[in-house]
From Swiss-Prot:
The protein's name in its UniProt record: Conotoxin im23b
Family: Belongs to the conotoxin K superfamily.
Predominant subcellular localization, coarse grouping: secreted
Location in or out of the cell: Secreted
Cystine connections: 34-41, 45-55, 56-71
Any one Gene Ontology cellular component term annotated for this protein: extracellular region
Coiled coil: none
GO molecular function: toxin activity
Function (record text): Neurotoxin that induces excitatory symptoms in mice following intracranial administration. No symptoms are observed after intraperitoneal and intravenous (tail vein) injections.
Length: 73
C-alpha cells in the first residue's frame, strides 16, 4: 500500500514538472524578447527561478544559441 502511494506521488510530481516546463516553453515563444537572442532568452528563463542547466537546455530547445560563457561549463 505504501509503495502504491509512493508511486502515485512520484507520477504526480513528474507530471507537474513536465507541465511546468511545457508552460515555460509556451510562454517563452509568446514573449518577443525571448525570441530575439539566446542571451535574452536565457536571462528571461533565469528570472523564472529555473536552474542554469535547465535554462541552457531550454534556450537550445527553441533553436537559439545560449550564452557560451555560462552554458559551456
Amino acid at each position: 500500500m505504501i509503495m502504491r502511494m509512493t508511486l502515485t506521488l512520484f507520477v504526480l510530481v513528474v507530471m507537474t514538472a513536465a507541465s511546468a516546463s511545457g508552460d515555460a516553453l509556451t510562454e517563452a515563444k509568446r514573449i518577443p524578447y525571448c525570441g530575439q537572442t539566446g542571451a535574452e532568452c536565457y536571462s528571461w528563463c533565469i528570472k523564472q527561478d529555473l536552474s542554469k542547466d535547465w535554462c541552457c537546455d531550454f534556450v537550445k530547445t527553441i533553436a537559439r544559441l545560449p550564452p557560451a560563457h555560462i552554458c559551456s561549463q
